[in-house]
UniProtKB/Swiss-Prot annotation:
<comment type="function">
    <text>Plays a role in maintaining the mitochondrial genome and in controlling the mtDNA escape. Involved in the regulation of mtDNA nucleotide structure and number. May have a dispensable role in early maturation of pre-rRNA.</text>
</comment>
<keyword id="KW-0507">mRNA processing</keyword>
<comment type="similarity">
    <text>Belongs to the YME2 family.</text>
</comment>
<dbReference type="GO" id="GO:0006397">
    <property type="term" value="P:mRNA processing"/>
</dbReference>
<dbReference type="InterPro" id="IPR039627">
    <property type="entry name" value="Yme2_C"/>
</dbReference>
<dbReference type="GO" id="GO:0003723">
    <property type="term" value="F:RNA binding"/>
</dbReference>
<keyword id="KW-0472">Membrane</keyword>
<feature type="domain" description="RRM">
    <location>
        <begin position="227"/>
        <end position="319"/>
    </location>
</feature>
<dbReference type="GO" id="GO:0005743">
    <property type="term" value="C:mitochondrial inner membrane"/>
</dbReference>
<feature type="transmembrane region" description="Helical">
    <location>
        <begin position="335"/>
        <end position="355"/>
    </location>
</feature>
<dbReference type="Pfam" id="PF00076">
    <property type="entry name" value="RRM_1"/>
</dbReference>
<keyword id="KW-0694">RNA-binding</keyword>
<protein>
    <recommendedName>
        <fullName>Mitochondrial escape protein 2</fullName>
    </recommendedName>
</protein>
<dbReference type="InterPro" id="IPR018850">
    <property type="entry name" value="Mt_escape_2_C"/>
</dbReference>
<dbReference type="InterPro" id="IPR012677">
    <property type="entry name" value="Nucleotide-bd_a/b_plait_sf"/>
</dbReference>
<dbReference type="Pfam" id="PF10443">
    <property type="entry name" value="RNA12"/>
</dbReference>
<keyword id="KW-0812">Transmembrane</keyword>
Amino acid sequence: MIDVISRYQASPLIESTLGYQSITIIFGNAHLQSSKKNVILAAMMRTRIPGLVPRICQTPLPWKPPTQLTRVRYARWSTSHAVSWFETGHIDLKENEGLLFINNIFPSKLQWLLRGPLGGMRSYEEAVKRIDRPQLAASDTFQIIQRVVPKNLNIQVKEVVPRFREGGAFVKYTRPSNVNDADIEASIKENLKEHPIRPWFNPFQEVQVCRVIGRPWIEDLYRLPSPRLKVAFHPVSPEASAADLNTETLYTLFRPYGKIRDIEKQPSDSKVTPRYAFVEFSRPKYAGMAKNCMHGFTVPEQEGGGKSGTRLKIKYERKIKLSMIKDWLLSHPRIVIPVLAALLAAITVTIFDPMRTFFIKLKIKSTLQTEENGVMQWIRKQVNKANIIYFGRKGADPRGLTAIWEDRQEDITRLQSWLMENVETFIVVHGPRGSGKRELVLDRALVDYKYKIVIDCKQIQDARGDSAKIARAASQVGYRPVFSWMNSISSFIDLAAQGMIGTKAGFSETLDAQLSNIWQNTATALKKVTLEHRKKNHKDSHLTDEEYLEAHPELRPVVVIDNYLHNASESSVVYDKITEWAAGLTAGNIAHVIFLTTDVSYAKPLSKALPNSVFRTITLGDCSLEVGRKFVVNHLAYESKDGKTQPRRAEELEDLDACIETLGGRVTDLEFMAHRIEAGETPRGAVNRIIEQSASEILKMFLLTPETIEQSWTHEQAWYLIKRLAESKDGALSYNEIVLSELFKENGEITLRALEHAELISIAAVNGCPQTIRPGKPVLRAAFKKVTENKALSSRMDLAIITQKINKENKSIGKYEEELSLLGSLPRQPRELTDRIQWVLNKVYSSQNKIAKYEKESAYLQKILRSEH
């Protein structure tokens, strides 16, 4: 049995963090004399106190015996021996003692598993045991040492000093006086040759043992093992001189430890002392074995060491390789991270931006792919001659919109003329929802226009999350490839970089920046599309790009921005970037920009982008009764001609005029009624269905749903307008009268604008000043009347309004009573306060009379509610 003498029991505990830091020393034996403590402290620090010293011990020193060695006898060091190699860095050998170095017993390549950056002085042995696998051979360090030494070898192991970075350990032993160290080494090597040991972490390489013939230095400096060694030649004493060993001598000394790749001597003209040489092994483990066995070895004179001998001092020489580059990159994040961000941006601009511009051009020119193809043109002619199908031509009007376009032909002509002019301003087509804005622009005014692109703001604004918004915006213009999913990952990288270097690295881009990239690439593609005509027209070759764009407004593409300011209250980032980009297109003569919007406040954001311009505006309203009738009749005539439905008799359409008058001239409502008539309903039945549907939407949106913080109106305010509009003779209310009413005295104009934005009402202005309030669309007046016919709902909403008025009067009376109390507390009643007191009393009297009146109405309404079932 091998008797292992523990080196941990009486050793000091050195607690340290990584690198050079101040240390705390706690002695395992509390009975040391103070003088001995001072000696130990001075020896370990090697400098005046306080000082900063490197950590000199790799193993933490709170002692725990290895659990695997249940049959091993432990001994204690004396206090004089407790700090032997901890303070000096050397293992002292006495008579009949020897030292071996065993390699490949620790996973040197897996140190990150054993010891992380926050591990401090955590025990390597404990870490090895946590990843230990006893079921495999040679999985435990102490078992390996037991198996290395033959059982018949009469030696006693006294101490094991691990060298984890080098994957090995020093084994100190005692031997009988009649046994030679060389014989012990030979016996151990013979045993390993017959019984090779392969650890679990490196099953392809065997454990090797060599005798230590030098005086190794046990250090814990940040010197990583390397296959390249620097061998310095030192004299054995200050007055002696060292020999410059030649290559043959170095080869003879170091070749037993492994394959040598190269030996490089110090240049002869170098003045650096002491002299040195580089010995490079084929593997780091050979270099580690040579360093630990040969460090401190004195080369005698007969072997070329000079008259007094030459002492070898060996250390690792780091090679310039990928690991060093990696270490440098990881240790300089303030430089590396911004450089990586810049490289990423450069790659994006160099590689992806031209691709994205190309795909955007395809999107802009997609409508002309068949028209510009000669083969497709020939096929179209042949098909037309055969009268089989009209490929590429418009046939009859399936929706019956001809009557509406005839009524709005003036607006269409005006819009087309604006596109031929060189005016640096926006074109705005404004109208309520369902008024046919998109159809008028795309299907009529731009039907024969060459290049156009449509951006639907509703799809972008309704997307959830920045990544979805970016993806929607990119799909609108054909911007690809787009890596919207990378934005979240880049945000985490930026957050980590901010924690490391204190500032963001710029990997992630905000929604604002991403949209700017998309619109900028789109502007580049639009400009290239326009300038393509310049090659065909040589007479303008002398003009610059800007002059050519200004001289040919008819060649510019058209950008149609639909649903502008849709749901703008949630976020304005999308609209801010679109407006800014559109202003750049217009000012740079790159494209014509047409905004389609239902929001009456469109002028405010557009004026910020073009502050000195007057917008070209087309306002679409509801069509007249005559046009509406013609639209419905044309729609029904087309369906009957197509054979889808039977023609309707005149008596079935006798009530059509009255129904259209009730429904109003909104195109979507007229089209819905026509579809219901096609399905077999009478005009009156179709209108009643539309009214019921509108009434349900009113109840859901304005009266019955719980009020939210974002909502700018109350149920009582919405009901007040609904009831007043239903009772009005001409369906209109005075704007000023509503603003001065009790329910709208506070922020009344803001509330009315919010209700207009929600399409409950519409506000008509004269010379820019609000004048009248009407329903949001004509059919809503009939829906308002239907809602007010519900006695239970009407009584409940009126009761809520009366309750609100009573509470308001009670608050007013409370304020008046406080003022009267204050005036009554005066020691004398000045004559000047008589009128004020009388005025306050009159206000209290008036408010009390109102409360009495409201309470009578409240009692009546409560009676109605109780009678309703």
